[in-house]
Amino acid sequence: MAYNIPERYQDLTPAPQLDKKTLNKMVWLSCFLQASFNYERMQACGWLWGILPGLQKIHTNKEDLKASMAHNLDFLNTHPFLVTFVMGIVLSLEQNKAETSTIRSVRISAAGPLGGIGDALFWLTLVPITAGLTANIAMDGSILGAILFLVIFNVAQFAVRWWLMHWSYGLGTKAVTMLTSNAKEFTRAASILGIFVVGGLIANYGTTSLRIVVG
C-alpha cells in the first residue's frame, strides 16, 4: 500500500543547526549517490542514504522522519559531483520544517541545472586541464603522470563537494536563486575555458602530415 506523504510535518519547531561533523559525514556519503542507480528513480536511493544522517538529527518525531524519508525517495537525477549543493539546500528547508511540497519542488529546481554545469565544470574544464598538466609526464613513460591525474582530479572534485555542502546549507533557498540566475553564464564560461585548453593541447602535442603533389 502506498504511503501518503503529509503536506506538513507534525513537529513544526525548527531544529538546531547541524554540526560540521554531520555535514562532513554526508559529504563522504554523497560519493555513493549512484551506488543504487536504477531507471525508475535514478539516484533516489543514493540520495536518501547520503542525506539520512541529517534527517535523523532534524526529525526527532518518528512520523516526521518517515514522511521525510518517503519524499526524499522521489525521482532524482543530478550531477554526482555537485549533489551536495542540493543536499545543503534541502537540509536547510528540512531544518526549518518547510512544507513537504515546497522541499520537493526546490529539490527538483536545484538538481536540474547542475547536469549541464557539472559537465562543463568537470568534463570540459577540469579533465582537459588536468590531462594537459600530466600528459607530458605520462608521455615520457612515467606512471607518475597517471597517478597525478587521479590525485588532482579526485582532490578537486571532493573539495567542491565539501565546499558546496557547507555553502549551500548556510545560504538555504538563496543558493537556488544564485544558481538559476547565473547557470547559463557559468556553463558558457567553463565550456570556453575547456575548449581553449583542448586547443592548446592539440597545438602542443598534435602533429599533421600533408603530402602535396605538383604537376
Task: Kindly give the residue locations of the regions a language model identified.
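Hydrophobic alpha-helical transmembrane segments and immediately flanking/interface helices
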Residues: 98-106, 209-215
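Transmembrane helix-bundle signature of multi-pass membrane transporters/permeases
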Residues: 72-73, 112, 150-155
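Soluble N-terminal domains of membrane-associated systems
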Residues: 1-102
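Membrane-helix interfacial "entry" motifs
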Residues: 18, 22, 104, 108-116, ...
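Hydrophobic alpha-helical transmembrane segments of multi-pass membrane proteins
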Residues: 35-38, 117-121, 186-190
